Amino acid sequence: MRIFGYARVSTSQQSLDIQIRALKDAGVKANRIFTDKASGSSTDREGLDLLRMKVEEGDVILVKKLDRLGRDTADMIQLIKEFDAQGVAVRFIDDGISTDGDMGQMVVTILSAVAQAERRRILERTNEGRQEAKLKGIKFGRRRTVDRNVVLTLHQKGTGATEIAHQLSIARSTVYKILEDERAS
């Protein structure tokens, strides 16, 4: 059984030093500590990717806190399941949680349920926000394309670029671009 450590910070205000010190105090050798400094939403985690390649069945990964392993609950659960499938246990120092043994399997099951509930909650909030935005008149999707012929017809009738832009709800620069393209052709 080899012991590895993983530490991650998601903002510049957070420090890896405290996490690394806790991992060393727990018996992890310095060359077996993998770290990432990235935003919480970033999926580019070189340290975690290296750790995934190094661990083997029977190994243990120590992490200072639950929230340091994954970007969110769903990500953390996915990683725990991935390591569990490899026969690798994950232990969280501060939280006193370990994924090995029968109790560990129960913890993984409970955390999976929490992750599923979190995904549903996020989906509900997203849909509520989308509905509220629609009620406020905010349009979704790609902007409609400008009918060049309408712009050219209005211009031929003597309508100015500013008025065309206003009538068609487009930028004046778009009107000028269409007129310029027409002159060039």
From Swiss-Prot:
Signal peptide: none annotated. Keywords: DNA integration, DNA recombination, DNA-binding, Transposable element. GO terms for molecular function: DNA binding; DNA strand exchange activity. It comes from the Bacteria. The keyword DNA-binding applies. GO terms for biological process: DNA integration. InterPro entries: Homeodomain-like_sf (IPR009057), Recombinase_CS (IPR006118), Resolv_N (IPR006119), Resolvase-like_N_sf (IPR036162), Resolvase_HTH_dom (IPR006120), SSR_resolvase (IPR050639). Residues 161-180 bind DNA. Residues 2-137 form the Resolvase/invertase-type recombinase catalytic domain. The active site is at residue 10. PANTHER family: DNA-INVERTASE FROM LAMBDOID PROPHAGE, RESOLVASE HOMOLOG YNEB. Resolvase catalyzes the resolution (a site-specific recombination) of the cointegrated replicon to yield the final transposition products. Belongs to the site-specific recombinase resolvase family. This is Transposon Tn3 resolvase. It comes from Escherichia coli.
